[in-house]
Amino acid sequence: MMFKPDCTAFAMIQPSALPGSYRHEDKTIDDIVAEVLEETQMIVDNGFDGVILQNMNDMPIKQNAAPEAIAYMTRIAYEIKHQYPQLILGVLVNWDGVASLAVADAVHADFVRVEHLFTGANVTSAGILEGQCVEIAALRKRIRSKVPVYADIQEVHGIPLGGKPIDDAAWEAVHEAFADGLFVSGKSKEESLEMIHAVRKKLPDTPVILGGGANGENIEELL
């Protein structure tokens, strides 16, 4: 059971730019792993239930992850899982849900977060990104993965094409594309809460995670 009965809190771990990415400078993968493990310990000390590993600093990124990014994310994810087996571990390889699932399955992570995109299409700074639910389903079947897939609905940093209501998009992701759970994020605290209420009404039994925007000032209200 991944979630606690009352509330489960995750912290994002976003390593320094990985070798091969545009913003990478001098750090080796060993340097980056050491930084990540130090950050993970801080997260544990502050009482979080889990972490989501994301290579956010590798921007700009198209949809298909580079081979080196997949390799380095696998190394980092393995080190977290090995050193902190009690932590819930999610994997998010920007912006490639197929790569995320491959990494997560290899290191026995607890779930995958698919952001940009699981269903539909989004306009982003890197162009139009298209849903990967078909490819993800095929990989799950092919490798017989049991890693749950959690999908972002209407990702906040892109513009969804088609204008589908948030609750309809959520229903589609679960019942037509077979996401195990959802991430929901608005551009403000108020929008996030409004979106979550709409999704929860449509999908009362589906796990829903607030995907971002929490800080020291609003975390109590969001919880």
Over which residues does each language-model region extend?
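A charged helix-plus-loop insertion that forms the helical arch/lid used to bind
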Residues: E68-M73
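Extreme N-terminal starter segment of soluble prokaryotic enzymes
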Residues: K4-A9
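Alpha/beta enzyme core
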Residues: F10, P15-Q63, T74-L87, D96-T206, ...
